[in-house]
């Protein structure tokens, strides 16, 4: 009688577990970033926060590459990702806002951070927070990136208050925000997908350089970093509303 072979090789199991541990490592780094914020070492904390963003940016692609759902079906990678992301994208930047002087007016620190945590909890628990066609529905809780820009550009407390309040509201507005690592439904063009990935990489490099050069700011890196943000928002609103306008025009033409 031939022994029953496992459905996957040892290397496949190792690769799948590695990806899950890689994702979970971002939670560990997130705790260290909280510690650095507590020590008022804000630049170091931002570096650690940047590492968690990098991990989040690539772990999904790695998971699909090694087929983690098939190899480890009893491990919920999406749940793990949400747990880690809520720490790094919500709790850590809220702690930054609470600890760092000058980020928010004293009377607004607690209400704003409370609003962020509650609205973000709503965002994370929606069934369609990530839509079937791979977009984020509503503002995708980029609070860590928001705090990064506020710190780098030393924006005023009033500006910070207005922006953070606006983003809390945008969580409830069903705009489809681009999922940078899942571009299949954004465009069918292979060239445009490659171009988008290149732009994302360039954004990472420019943001890296902004942090390296802090407190000095270089116009090139500022332009590239904010230019990507502008492009991201344009594509998100275009992808949300253009199909609606197109369908309405088509319906009117038929009438």
Swiss-Prot record:
Q: Which organism is it from?
A: Legionella pneumophila subsp. pneumophila (strain Philadelphia 1 / ATCC 33152 / DSM 7513)
The transmembrane residues are 14-34, 43-63, 77-97, 104-124, 134-154, 156-175, 191-211, 218-238
Q: Which GO terms describe its biological process?
A: phospholipid biosynthetic process
InterPro entries for this protein: CDP-OH_P_trans, CDP-OH_PTrfase_TM_dom, PcS
A single cellular component GO annotation: plasma membrane
Q: Which reaction does it catalyse?
A: a CDP-1,2-diacyl-sn-glycerol + choline = a 1,2-diacyl-sn-glycero-3-phosphocholine + CMP + H(+)
User: What sections of the sequence does the record tag as coiled-coil?
Assistant: none
**Enzyme Commission number(s):** 2.7.8.24
Purpose of the protein: Condenses choline with CDP-diglyceride to produce phosphatidylcholine and CMP. Affects virulence of this bacterium when there is a complete loss of phosphatidylcholine formation due to absence of both the synthase (pcs) and the methylation (pmtA) pathways. Reduced virulence results from lowered yields of bacteria within host macrophages and because of loss of high multiplicity cytotoxicity.
Provide the membrane-side ranges marked Periplasmic in the record: 35-42, 98-103, 155, 212-217
NCBIfam families the UniProt entry points to: PhCholSynLeg (NF045886)
The membrane topology term of the UniProt record is: Multi-pass membrane protein
Where in or outside the cell? Cell inner membrane
| GO MF, one annotated term | phosphatidylcholine synthase activity
Cofactor requirement: Mn(2+)
The Swiss-Prot or TrEMBL record describes its family as follows: Belongs to the CDP-alcohol phosphatidyltransferase class-I family.
Write the protein's name.
Answer: Phosphatidylcholine synthase
């Amino acid at each position: 009688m031939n022994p029953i072979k496992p459905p996957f090789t040892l290397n496949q199991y190792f690769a799948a577990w590695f990806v899950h541990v890689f994702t979970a490592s971002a939670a560990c780094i997130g705790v260290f970033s909280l510690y650095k914020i507590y020590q008022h070492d804000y630049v170091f904390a931002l570096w650690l926060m940047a590492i968690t963003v990098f991990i989040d940016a690539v772990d999904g692609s790695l998971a699909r590459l090694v087929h983690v759902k098939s190899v480890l079906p009893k491990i919920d990678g999406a749940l793990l990702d949400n747990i880690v992301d809520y720490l790094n994208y919500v709790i850590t930047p809220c702690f930054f806002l609470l600890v760092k002087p000058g980020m928010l007016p004293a009377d607004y620190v607690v209400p704003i951070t409370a609003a962020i945590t509650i609205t973000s909890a709503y965002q994370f628990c929606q069934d369609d927070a990530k839509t079937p066609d791979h977009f984020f529905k509503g503002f995708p809780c980029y609070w860590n990136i928001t705090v990064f820009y506020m710190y780098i550009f030393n924006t005023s407390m009033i500006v910070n208050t207005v922006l953070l309040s606006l983003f809390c509201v945008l969580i409830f507005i069903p705009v489809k925000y681009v999922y940078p690592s899942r571009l299949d439904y954004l465009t069918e063009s292979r060239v445009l997908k490659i171009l988008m990935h290149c732009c994302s990489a360039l954004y990472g490099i420019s943001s890296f350089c902004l942090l390296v050069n802090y407190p000095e700011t270089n116009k090139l890196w500022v332009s590239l970093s904010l230019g990507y943000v502008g492009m991201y928002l344009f594509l998100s609103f275009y992808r949300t509303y253009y199909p609606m306008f197109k369908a309405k025009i088509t319906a009117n033409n038929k009438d």
